[in-house]
Amino acid sequence: MFILKLFVYTVVIFFVSLFIFGFLSNDPRRNPEPEED
């Protein structure tokens, strides 16, 4: 059961990370200039 739970959490975190990364990358409010911190 621990293996299954670990696998599920890994998949969930993976998809959430992809979603957040894609959302931030496609956010029109961000300036295209990479020098902005």
Curated annotation (Swiss-Prot):
Presence of keyword Membrane: yes
InterPro entries the UniProt entry points to: PSII_PsbI, PSII_PsbI_sf
Keywords tagged on the record: Membrane, Photosynthesis, Photosystem II, Plastid, Reaction center, Transmembrane, Transmembrane helix
Pfam families named in the record: PsbI
Membrane topology category: Single-pass membrane protein
Subcellular location: Plastid membrane
Principal location class: plastid
Family to which this protein belongs: Belongs to the PsbI family.
Protein name: Photosystem II reaction center protein I
